């Protein structure tokens, strides 16, 4: 589902720049796209306490993520109609909705997998080869965490801080994106390993305006096993150490 959403985001973003000769391929592409659905969480809403409260998890998943899914599906259906009708003005207007809500769905689907209760390994440091790669590029795991926290705290307004793999440069990177932009909007060669939501809805009910405290505590429930699995999958043909 995540790959499907990313594809449709880029179809929408670049729709007006495509040559007319390619227009004939866009409608079948849109028709093949499936609507998004809210994924179930792999843990209970209170399983991440005290790092993240049950109240926040319920609101974040049931309200915020669900809204992105609903609005994305609505925009996707409208885009299909606009393309079928040749309504280029509406196609242009729908691009920002597709990007924002589709991106919100993509990011949150990753975010839930990036978290795990302590009793299920949340916060447990990663194993090799990811551990060695982190040491090589950031000096230590603590060095990576400090950089992530600093970059996340410095995001102006709303956005995300990412720990990712740059397959082109063959190295690990820390990046930030604004609003609900997925990491892939900075380049298809970037693979998200960990994404941390720094929108206020992710922490304000519990931490108020103390974003730095939220960033400090969230590492106790980070699912490093998931990050390590994604890293290994995408580095089988790379040497990044």
Curated annotation (Swiss-Prot):
Subcellular location: Mitochondrion matrix
Keywords: Manganese, Metal-binding, Mitochondrion, Oxidoreductase, Transit peptide
SUPFAM superfamilies for the chain: Fe,Mn superoxide dismutase (SOD), C-terminal domain, Fe,Mn superoxide dismutase (SOD), N-terminal domain
GO BP annotation list: floral organ abscission
Catalytic activity from the UniProt record: 2 superoxide + 2 H(+) = H2O2 + O2
InterPro entries: Fe/Mn_Superoxide_Dismutase (IPR050265), Mn/Fe_SOD (IPR001189), Mn/Fe_SOD_BS (IPR019833), Mn/Fe_SOD_C (IPR019832), Mn/Fe_SOD_N (IPR019831), Mn/Fe_SOD_N_sf (IPR036324), SOD_C_sf (IPR036314)
Bound cofactor: record note: Binds 1 Mn(2+) ion per subunit.
Binding site for Mn(2+): 60, 108, 197, 201
The UniProt record lists the keyword Cytoplasm: no
Record-listed E.C. numbers: 1.15.1.1
Pfam families: Sod_Fe_C, Sod_Fe_N
Enzyme class: oxidoreductase
Keyword Cytoplasm: no
GO terms for cellular component: mitochondrial matrix
Required cofactor names: Mn(2+)
One annotated GO molecular function: superoxide dismutase activity
Function: Destroys superoxide anion radicals which are normally produced within the cells and which are toxic to biological systems.
Subunit structure: Homotetramer.
Family statement drawn from the similarity comment of this UniProt entry: Belongs to the iron/manganese superoxide dismutase family.
Protein name, as recorded: Superoxide dismutase [Mn] 2, mitochondrial
Species assigned in the record: Arabidopsis thaliana (Mouse-ear cress)
Source organism phylogeny: Eukaryota, Viridiplantae, Streptophyta, Embryophyta, Tracheophyta
